[in-house]
A protein has these predicted regions:
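Conserved beta-loop-beta/alpha segment of the NTase-like Rossmann-fold superfamily
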Residues: 61, 69-161, 199
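A structural motif detector for beta-strand N-caps
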Residues: 259, 265, 271-278, 284, ...
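Extended, small-residue-rich solenoid/repeat segments and analogous flexible loops
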Residues: 216-301
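Short internal beta-strands
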Residues: 50-54, 143-144, 337
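Catalytic-core segments of class I nucleotidyltransferases/pyrophosphorylases
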Residues: 112-114, 121, 127-134, 147-150, ...
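N-terminal glycine-rich phosphate-binding loop and ensuing alpha1 helix
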Residues: 1-62
Length: 379
């Protein structure tokens, strides 16, 4: 079995994180989401992986290279062009269109392929899913999970018969129109014949175009409703909840890194905490090279990225700070994700640092205006 990771989208619903990162590169426990996918594929015997890329493609390619460090081979298919000014312009072909481009270029898909979205954490038993796919004689299989009816408008919904054969596929139907609450997880098993149905050179989507085509033609298209961990990072709220879940131990197979120095408090290498008047209530992770000044307060679940600096009197409450964030004296950050010059609350409302009370935070690498010890001053 080969694999295809879909990684060409812009991830607009996860801004500001995706202003500088493609969605598959958003970190969980300091590691990109896509890295967990690659490791999962390798554990299930998949050694050849193609990735379609477009928006900020170089971030993915530079991090993963050709995949040797993961014990796999990774190839890339760029979707876009360079304009007359020499600028790279992303131009995604849609989830199915990207697969077609790869097939026409080099014929990569010559056996069963598992297709996955690059922005979800999963622990699906791929070997079991493949066995069932082949047992049914399926041309295409979509892995589904039941979701609350009120959330069907956020997913592609699969309508199937008692044998699991897909009769209809609804792309994000309104609650009143949904005929099922079995949601597509963005994990698919395809035989090469499926790719023959995708038109050449067109933007073509799996959920809204390919799946309805398979169902309408009565082809052997099945769903498998399985119980497994599926964490879809579709929005900033999802991301916030994932990190909260990791820190509270609510997500299986994921442990907090670092060394536990107090009950529920983990720290990375070479981090300095002045405990004089400082209050830290776990679960809290403080990354490597951080500084926590005397009199600071940190209430978990909180994740503080490496190289960050929490000043005296500052309060960080149930928040996520990306690397090199300086929380200024006497400032409170409550239930926020802070990424460089932006913060986002749980509801997804974004604010620039210029809108924050008392300045809020700054770049911990910028020492301008920061009082330095006398021995650091050059005379």
């Amino acid at each position: 079995m080969k694999a295809m990771i879909l990684a060409a989208g812009k991830g607009t619903r996860v801004r500001p994180l995706t202003y500088e990162l493609p969605k598959p590169m958003i970190p969980i426990l300091g590691k990109p989401v896509m890295a967990y996918l690659v490791e999962h594929l390798q554990r299930h015997g998949v050694s050849e992986i193609m990735v379609n890329v477009s928006y900020l493609h170089e971030k993915i390619e530079e991090y993963f290279g050709e995949g040797h460090q993961y014990g796999v081979q990774i190839g890339y298919s760029f979707e876009g062009y360079t304009n007359n000014q020499g600028e790279v312009v992303p131009e995604p072909l849609g989830s199915a269109g990207g697969i077609k481009k790869i097939q026409e270029f080099g014929g990569f898909f010559d056996e069963t392929v598992v297709v996955l979205c690059g922005d979800a954490l999963i622990d699906l038993d791929l070997k079991s899913a493949l066995y069932e796919h082949r047992r049914k004689g399926a041309m295409a299989t979509v892995i589904t999970r039941e979701v609350p009816w009120e959330k069907t408008s956020s997913y592609g919904v699969v309508v199937s018969d008692a044998d699991g054969r897909v009769r209809e596929f609804q792309e994000k139907p309104a609650r009143a129109d949904a005929k099922s609450n079995c949601a597509s997880t963005g994990i698919y098993l395809f035989e090469p014949e499926v790719i023959d149905l995708i038109p050449s050179g067109e933007v073509f989507d799996i959920g809204s175009q390919l799946f309805p085509l398979l169902a309408q033609r009565g082809l052997p298209f099945y769903c498998q409703t399985r119980k497994f961990n599926w964490i879809d990072i579709g929005s900033v709220k999802d991301y916030w909840e994932v990190l909260q879940g990791v820190l509270t131990g609510g997500i299986g197979n994921m442990t907090v890194p670092g060394v536990q120095v107090e009950e529920g408090v983990w720290v990375g290498l070479n981090t300095r905490i002045d405990w004089n008047g400082t209050r830290i209530v776990g679960p809290v992770y403080i990354g490597s090279g951080c500084q926590i000044e005397a009199g600071a307060t940190i209430i978990g679940p909180t994740w503080i990225g490496h190289g960050s600096h929490v000043c005296s009197g500052a309060r960080v409450v149930r928040s996520v700070l990306f690397e090199y964030t300086r929380v200024l004296p006497d400032v409170t950050l409550d239930e926020l994700i802070v990424f460089k010059d932006y913060s986002v609350d749980r509801a997804g409302e974004m604010r620039h640092v210029s809108q924050a009370e008392c300045g809020g935070w700054s770049n911990a690498r910028d020492r301008r205006g920061v009082r330095r010890p006398a021995e650091d001053v050059v005379k």
